[in-house]
């Protein structure tokens, strides 16, 4: 099973809110997921990013591939530095 860390869209029309989830790469964007590890709210000012570092590091070490947007969120949250160690 190829696992990805990606965003799951929630919220209302024209007011997106995203949950950072670990999901099978073949499942739909808003479909089944294995575990929720955080959230991202691009509408709030400043943008709200909350990611559970322990869960994120555990999943990446187990082979989960973060998408490009999630990599950027990891960098903004400071998790990227801990992954490179």
Swiss-Prot record:
GO-annotated molecular function: structural constituent of ribosome
Signal peptide: none
Keyword Ribonucleoprotein: yes
Family: Belongs to the bacterial ribosomal protein bS16 family.
Gene: rpsP
Annotated keywords: Ribonucleoprotein, Ribosomal protein
GO CC list: cytoplasm; small ribosomal subunit
Disulfide pattern: none
Organism placement in taxonomy: Bacteria, Bacillati, Bacillota, Clostridia, Eubacteriales
InterPro entries: Ribosomal_bS16 (IPR000307), Ribosomal_bS16_dom_sf (IPR023803)
Iron in keyword set: no
An individual GO BP term: translation
This protein's name: Small ribosomal subunit protein bS16
TM ranges: none
PANTHER family linked to this entry: 30S RIBOSOMAL PROTEIN S16, SMALL RIBOSOMAL SUBUNIT PROTEIN BS16M
């Amino acid at each position: 099973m190829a696992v990805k860390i990606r965003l799951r869209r929630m919220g209302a029309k024209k007011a997106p809110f995203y949950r950072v989830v670990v999901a099978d790469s073949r499942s739909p964007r808003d479909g089944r997921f294995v575990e929720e590890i955080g959230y991202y709210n691009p509408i709030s000012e400043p943008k709200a990013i909350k990611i559970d570092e322990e869960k994120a590091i555990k999943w990446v070490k187990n082979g989960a591939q973060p998408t490009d947007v999630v990599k950027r969120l990891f960098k903004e949250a400071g998790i990227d530095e801990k992954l490179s160690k």
